[in-house]
Amino acid sequence: MVYKILIVDDDQEILKLMKTALEMRNYEVATHQNISLPLDITDFQGFDLILLDIMMSNIEGTEICKRIRREISTPIIFVSAKDTEEDIINGLGIGGDDYITKPFSLKQLVAKVEANIKREERNKHAVHVFSEIRRDLGPITFYLEERRVCVNGQTIPLTCREYDILELLSQRTSKVYTREDIYDDVYDEYSNALFRSISEYIYQIRSKFAPYDINPIKTVRGLGYQWHG
């Protein structure tokens, strides 16, 4: 299977370097250099992963992410020279699934891409292994093959990481998961900023269920988080 990757960056040289590095690993790569408003959502559909630069002249990558997140669940890796913990947490909080800071090596870039794609494949494979395609928990329904969550038939626009966290908690509704448990399930590497992002993801999940007067995640003080049906 050939995986399709979209790179969005207004620096032509960086686009060329990233495109070449990924094509050498047999990825099919498309690029966008001059993104501007209004966005055409079809420009971002049909890909297995998106690499999105944050600091661009016409529109920031964070704004692009906010505008397309309700329409696509494709993993998004932010690429940016903004490298503080708060920058990373903010990027993940508005819909990013991972973050790579400039300057970076092409080996690091490829490793990030491969880790995210492998995780998506493992998640899809797990559904088939356990032969569960639907999970009903009160008004909340998981469509596991589609990696989609609905409340009374209405789809909740979760990012890949948000879905992973919520689905993990729903597997064993009586278990309390520590932040370490959740982190180990959704990330393949350690980073303090990524670890801190777990709380932000929990906040974003809750905010997306709030219009339905549902809070699917209970905080167990001093321990962690638990499914709250």
Swiss-Prot record:
What does the record say about PTM?
Phosphorylated by NisK.
| Any one GO CC term of the record | protein-DNA complex
InterPro entries noted in UniProt: CheY-like_superfamily, OmpR/PhoB-type_DNA-bd, Sig_transdc_resp-reg_receiver, WalR-like, WH-like_DNA-bd_sf
GO molecular function annotation: phosphorelay response regulator activity; transcription cis-regulatory region binding
Indicate the residues that the entry says bind DNA: 132-229
Which keywords describe this protein according to UniProt? Activator, DNA-binding, Phosphoprotein, Transcription, Transcription regulation, Two-component regulatory system
Q: Which terms does the UniProt entry file under GO BP?
A: regulation of DNA-templated transcription
Q: PANTHER family this protein is in?
A: REGULATOR OF RPOS, RESPONSE REGULATOR SAER
What is the official name of this protein in its record? Nisin biosynthesis regulatory protein NisR
